[in-house]
Swiss-Prot record:
Primary role: Odorant receptor.
Keywords, ordered alphabetically: Cell membrane, Disulfide bond, G-protein coupled receptor, Membrane, Olfaction, Receptor, Sensory transduction, Transducer, Transmembrane, Transmembrane helix
CDD domains (UniProt xref): 7tmA_OR2T-like
Organism classification: Eukaryota, Metazoa, Chordata, Craniata, Vertebrata
Gene that this polypeptide is encoded by: OR2T7
InterPro entries (UniProt xref): GPCR_Rhodpsn, GPCR_Rhodpsn_7TM, Olfact_rcpt
SUPFAM superfamilies (UniProt xref): Family A G protein-coupled receptor-like
UniProt name for this protein: Olfactory receptor 2T7
Organism: Homo sapiens
Places the protein is found: Cell membrane
GO cellular component: plasma membrane
Length: 308
């Protein structure tokens, strides 16, 4: 089976400081997302459609960062930079599936905010448990279609050029540069596919938030307006970070960015974004911070009783 070797940001091993930074980001991302899932599960105040969808977003972030970072860290420790063809295919498929699922989930989450703010009286019926699970299933289905469509085609190209992927994981643009055949037709098809993958959820987000802004503008109570803006602003920040980086990589023509810039942007939305998401959603959310304080208080009280 062919073996593909890859670089991690450069042809030389990364410094211990950079390795420690990536490890810290990875551990922080896993821990913060796990804590958020646990809080949403154990605190009855967080048993709402919005927090259920946030827990699903955290689950995807855990899987997303775990697809790439552990392999990169192990390679640094073992001083090896090789990945098998099967391993590269699996990483490629999981990356596309999870990224696509996150695109669709972020888009559908805006519908939840639209219903909560614009149709609050019908919110329990329109965002029932069944509807929430359908949203989750639709996001997974959309991501899986992306993975199943693009992965077989990408990996069937003959890699008869250099075996070194100028990237830190098996991302599509970096893999296509290794092919010795003409991939222009496929790149055009992939470009159209990516446009649709981004445009459909983004259109849903734009439509939802346009209606939300109109509703917020018409609100007479300042407190209700402030709460609505605070609830939606966190989601918009996450959408801007994730969609912005993805559009730069897959929509902007390759002539406008270098491989080094591609690696930097990819590191941002594959490594940093999963860590930032729970922080962005939690730091400004009184319900989540209140639930965390409640759990910490219980742990401290339990420790004092045990010690006594």
């Amino acid at each position: 089976m062919p073996t593909l070797s890859f670089w991690v940001c450069s042809a030389t091993p990364v410094s211990p400081g950079f390795f420690a930074l990536i490890l810290l980001v990875f551990v922080t991302s896993i821990a913060s997302n796990v804590v958020k899932i646990i809080l949403i599960h154990i605190d009855s105040r967080l048993h709402t459609p919005m927090y259920f969808l946030l827990s699903q977003l955290s689950l995807r972030d855990i899987l997303y960062i775990s697809t790439i970072v552990p392999k990169m860290l192990v390679d640094q420790v073992m001083s090896q930079r090789a990945i098998s063809f099967a391993g590269c295919t699996a990483q490629h498929f999981l990356y596309l599936t999870l990224a696509g699922a996150e695109f669709f989930l972020l888009g559908l989450m805006s519908c939840d905010r639209y219903v909560a703010i614009c149709n609050p009286l019908h919110y329990p019926d329109l965002m029932s448990r069944k509807i929430c699970w359908l949203i989750v299933a639709a996001a997974w289905l959309g991501g899986s279609i992306d993975g199943f469509l693009l992965t077989p085609v990408t990996m069937q190209f003959p890699f008869c050029a250099s075996r070194e992927i100028n990237h830190f994981f098996c991302e599509v643009p970096a893999l296509l540069k290794l092919s010795c055949t003409d991939t222009s037709a496929y790149e055009t098809a992939m470009y159209v596919c990516c446009i649709m993958m981004l445009l459909i959820p983004f259109s849903v987000i734009s439509g939802s938030y346009t209606r939300i802004l109109i509703t917020v503008y018409r609100m007479s109570e300042a407190e209700g307006r402030r709460k609505a803006v605070a609830t939606c602003s966190s989601h918009m920040v996450v959408v801007s970070l994730f969609y912005g980086a993805a559009m730069y990589t897959y929509v902007l023509p390759h002539s406008y960015h270098t491989p080094e810039q591609d690696k930097a942007v990819s590191a941002f939305y594959t490594i940093l974004t999963p860590m930032l998401n729970p922080l962005i959603y939690s730091l400004r959310n009184k319900d989540v911070t209140g639930a965390l304080q409640k759990v910490v208080g219980r742990c401290v009280s339990s420790g004092k009783v045990t010690t006594f």
